[in-house]
Amino acid sequence: MALLQIAEPGQSPQPHQRRLAVGIDLGTTNSMVAALRSGRSEPLPDAQGNVILPSAVRYLEGRNEVGQAARDAASSDPLNTVLSVKRLMGRGLADVKQLGEQLPYRFVGGESHMPFIDTVQGPKSPVEVSADILKVLRERAEATLGGELVGAVITVPAYFDDAQRQATKDAARLAGLNVLRLLNEPTAAAVAYGLDQNAEGVVAIYDLGGGTFDISILRLTAGVFEVLATGGDTALGGDDFDHAIAGWIIEQAGLSSDLDPATQRALLQTACAAKEALTDADVVSVSHGAWHGELTRNAFEAMIEPLVARSLKACRRAVRDSGVELEEVSAVVMVGGSTRVPRVREAVGALFGRTPLTSIDPDQVVAIGAAIQADTLAGNRREGGELLLLDVIPLSLGLETMGGLMEKVIPRNTTIPVARAQEFTTYKDGQSAMMIHVLQGERELISDCRSLARFELRGIPAMVAGAAKIRVTFQVDADGLLSVAARELGSGVEASIQVKPSYGLTDGEIARMLKDSFEHAGSDKHARQLREHQVDGERLLEAVQGALDADGDRLLSSDERDAIEFQMQELRDLLAGTDGAAIEQQTKRLSQVTDAFAARRLDSTVKAALAGRNLNEIEE
């Protein structure tokens, strides 16, 4: 007779059986899935023993090819073979048009403004293409591990915004994966090295992949990984090295820059092969059609020097943001296949003054770290206790206040998950609604920040301006996704929004936001101070005008009223200009001139309230 398996509600009948979870590195050029096996995190191979899955999908009549077969067909069937789809995740048609010369696809628009790639199977969104890659990785993992997955940790660049992160989660869901967490790629690398080497101190994670670059500064102490600062470039990677070589071939071979898709693809494959060969060789033979030439490592390094310099500039900025000095960085971890380029390792080593760590395969380190985190989140306790992991948000989050100013609620580099609240109030008497405008960025004026969402809080009880208390709460979950709620504390009316990312963001915006915030810090501070003085002046003018309309004839002599109106006109004239100090002084002057009027109004109000009441009634 079979024995019944009895367990507490919610507990597995086999409490010591491991729950199957994986880490997935969904890369621009290559992807990989890893899992903990026999206490060690390792990549999972396919039936042929390959652990790397090229991030390539080819659409044919009635079937798909994913991986190496698709990549091999890219030259012969470029319109139906999608490579580097990660660059399109969460992007809009405007961004695709900027990349049009580099991407040999036919793009069509959709209602969501998401770009669709026209294939023989019909339009395919970047989310669908990524889902096809993730599905192959899921099937590989389940076949290797011998069971159904409870979930996966999927890595994304630290610089991925809401739209790109949400697109990644959508792709996973479409592939039949339960996302335990989205994990920043540099943080995943820190997890891998922290486990294997028990590192402590300040560590820089230099992650140069096929399409994106990330730099993270982390402090590692006793199992705690805290990201101090992040930076990078969403449009910098090994693909750009390939395009540099391809441009050189076009120039040397005397080719037209207006190439058909098949020639473009073949040219990029030739360039990629030359780049990889120059990792070990000083010179490589290059051929394209009837043209033959030689490319030296020195010439290649000269081509990519501006790209390497861009990455180093981002490194310096991240170190500055972290509050540490370059000399305090005790280790530099290299992540991504593009860090195999000798010039990259040399430049990074020179910047930080130490030889970068490369003991874990840079193509595998992210997946290995993600698998460790997935195993923990799946409920499998690790020896030595739990791993505490702290990510940060890359750009400040806030909302619009009067005068078009950006009020930061959650500053950039704040550890997530996080919830922060601030209280705001109404601007006008009797105001019954408030528009909440959610923004992202580092600048002081909303015109220089990115608009994320808008929603309206209605039903605010009628009160004088400034009496209502509206608490606005920003909440960022562990995946870096944002929700915002607003509540009027007196009445309890509330409204909220789950920020639905727009797919219309262009590639350079995030990097430009940070760059502009540094370059315009001084002028932004001046602009904010000016606008604050203008808002204060406008509010005082409105309040004084309301008081004059209500009680001016009753409580003021004609000379007193003329004096107040003269100061009001002086302030109006100054508000049309840009002299913040003068506006501030005139606002104070008008306030002083109206002090006696305000006192009379208060006395009048008190007398009216006490009229007809005796002392006993007042004391009660």
Swiss-Prot record:
Q: Name one GO molecular function term.
A: ATP hydrolysis activity
PROSITE patterns found in the cross-reference section: HSP70_1 (PS00297), HSP70_2 (PS00329), HSP70_3 (PS01036)
Q: State the source organism's domain of life.
A: Bacteria
A Pfam family hit: HSP70
One BP term from GO: iron-sulfur cluster assembly
Cross-referenced InterPro entries: ATPase_NBD, Heat_shock_70_CS, HscA_NBD, HSP70_C_sf, HSP70_peptide-bd_sf, Hsp_70_fam, ISC_FeS_clus_asmbl_HscA
CDD domains associated with the record: ASKHA_NBD_HSP70_HscA (cd10236)
Q: Which NCBIfam families match?
A: HscA, PRK05183.1
Protein family according to the UniProt entry? Belongs to the heat shock protein 70 family.
Q: What is this protein called?
A: Chaperone protein HscA homolog
Species assigned in the record: Pseudomonas putida (strain ATCC 47054 / DSM 6125 / CFBP 8728 / NCIMB 11950 / KT2440)
UniProt lists the gene as hscA
